Regions:
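Non-catalytic all-alpha helical scaffold/repeat segments
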Residues: 1-172
Length: 172
């Protein structure tokens, strides 16, 4: 929605000012979840403190009410990943999506499966899993997950595992 986008931009400009409001609307039911997601996206855009962001993110990422925003939640894990804040729970969250999420159910862009890989939940999760190569403790599960993804029925998901495969040369 246009108003949610405006809210996201306002939060990006003043993330610390809007944080209490984001927490308040997270706990309420009368305001659309679009605003919660927009506010959290604004925190990422505004380079809000990554450690504090991780605390906020962990309050919502497993909540069923946010399942329709899964792609945006996956994208937000990139902010945590670039700040070395992926823990076992978040990594497992990504692996579960990569292996079990129903999206994609069909090919969206048959002429460009690479683009398609960035526009579905399983593909995006695979991209983010590969980017977790810096975490030595996840090395085995990264490869196990990619091995399973190789059998995914959707080309775009399998392609997602190949795009960044070269970075895994850094894993022992």
């Amino acid at each position: 929605s246009e108003n949610a986008n405006a809210f996201e931009n306002e939060v990006a400009g003043r993330p610390y000012f809007f944080l209490p409001l984001i927490y308040k609307i997270m706990d309420g039911e009368e305001i659309s979840r679009y605003y919660v997601i927009a506010g959290i996206n604004g925190l990422v855009k505004g380079n809000y403190d990554p450690t504090e962001f991780a605390v906020l993110f962990k309050k919502i990422y497993k909540e069923h009410i946010y399942s329709s925003f899964k792609r945006q939640l996956i994208r937000m894990t990139g902010y945590l990943n670039q700040n070395d804040l992926i823990d076992q729970d978040l990594f497992d969250f990504l692996c579960d999506i990569a292996l079990n999420d129903p999206d994609p159910a069909k090919v969206l862009n048959p002429n460009n499966q690479i683009i398609d890989s960035f526009n579905n939940n399983r593909g995006m999760a695979v991209h983010e899993i590969v980017r977790c190569f810096r975490y030595k403790r996840f090395a085995e599960k990264i490869f196990l997950t990619l091995f399973k993804v190789a059998n995914d029925p959707m080309d775009s998901v399998r392609i997602a595992s190949l795009i960044d495969l070269a970075v895994l040369m850094n894993v022992d």
